[in-house]
A protein has these predicted regions:
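Ribosome large-subunit tunnel/peptidyl-transferase-proximal elements
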Residues: 2-116
Length: 116
């Protein structure tokens, strides 16, 4: 069984590396990086040229179903970035499928005024 787990982990890491090779953020257009655990979802806006996180939001303290919380997280990160005068972002979904919570977070960010 550990060999199968190792193979899945290798495939996941390969997807992450492939995605990161294509996606890079700057101060004008930061990378919106998504992290999803079994209970929570978080997102941070990263300027890769400097290596600095501009803003970060997670769903701790929010109520509702996971997809609804992800939508709210998207709206919150959009509001924080618009305060910083950032409207354009690059969406980095990492190895997660663009479905469910990840899609809902992206939709919330768009609803908040961000452009991908």
């Amino acid at each position: 069984m550990s060999e199968m787990k190792n193979r899945k982990h290798q495939l996941r890491q390969r997807r992450v590396v492939r995605t990161r090779a294509k996606v890079s953020g700057s101060a004008e257009r930061p990378r919106l990086a998504v992290y999803k655990s079994l209970k929570h979802i978080s997102v941070q806006a990263i300027d890769d040229l400097v290596g600095k996180t501009l803003s970060a939001v997670n769903d701790k303290g929010l109520t509702g179903k996971p997809v609804e919380r992800a939508f709210e997280v998207g709206k919150l990160i959009a509001a924080k970035l618009i305060e910083l005068k950032v409207e354009n972002v690059v969406f980095d979904k990492r190895h997660y499928r663009y479905h469910g919570q990840v899609k809902s977070l992206a939709d919330g960010a768009r609803a908040g005024g961000l452009k991908f």
